[in-house]
A protein has these predicted regions:
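Short, compositionally biased low-complexity segments
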Residues: 1-3, 93-94
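Short, Lys/Arg-rich, polar N-terminal cytosolic tail immediately upstream
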Residues: 2-12
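Soluble catalytic domains of membrane acyltransferases
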Residues: 11-181
Length: 181
């Protein structure tokens, strides 16, 4: 967005629910962590969509931390069963979290795959239109020392976003890996 009187790009105002959730998450992460260091944040892309990927060692702390420190509005991907938990489900929706169905959590695999394909398509569209999306490509939280097997969703989302951006003359989306430790 560009201000008419100054010709300077002005970021859009974030939705109130998102701003309140971010403030709450920052409060929690400030209690949880003694210190948060961000390295090379000056290298974050300033145009085009972004797909952030990171491993998932600490359950709900990881997305809260990412939402606390990353700029702009972040759409995060989470397993759909979390949305069934009454208070948490409302908080996730207010935080711009998108549910994804894991095959192990679905009774109707065909319908689950179709819903996920639709969600992956909408996520790639968001990215190709300049939004930021966070995904945990292992698909599970764990405390292992190394990375588990990575699922294909992140790659499919990014490839579709790049294809869409090229077809529509928009800036190419970027891929930003994040290390948590």
């Amino acid at each position: 967005m560009v201000s008419a009187d100054e010709g300077v790009a002005v970021p859009p105002k974030l939705p109130l629910s998102y701003r309140l959730c971010r403030r709450f998450y920052r409060f929690l992460t400030n209690i949880w962590f003694r210190e948060i260091n961000i390295v090379d944040d000056e290298n974050l892309p300033n145009e085009g969509g972004i797909l952030y990927i990171t491993w998932h060692p600490s359950g709900l702390i990881d997305p809260m931390l990412m939402m606390s420190v990353l700029p702009g509005q972040l759409t995060t991907v989470a397993k759909h069963t979390l949305f069934r938990i009454p208070v948490l489900g409302r908080l996730l929706r207010a935080s711009s979290v998108v549910p994804i169905e894991r095959p192990s959590d679905s009774k109707d695999l065909g319908a689950s795959r179709q819903r996920n394909a639709d969600r992956l398509s909408s996520l790639s569209s968001l990215i190709s239109n300049g939004a930021s999306v966070l995904i945990f490509p292992e698909g599970v939280t764990h405390a292992d020392a190394g990375v588990r097997t990575v699922r294909s969703g992140a790659a499919r989302i990014l490839l579709a976003a790049i294809r869409d951006a090229k077809e529509n003359g928009r800036p190419l989306p970027k891929f930003v890996p994040i290390g948590l430790h």
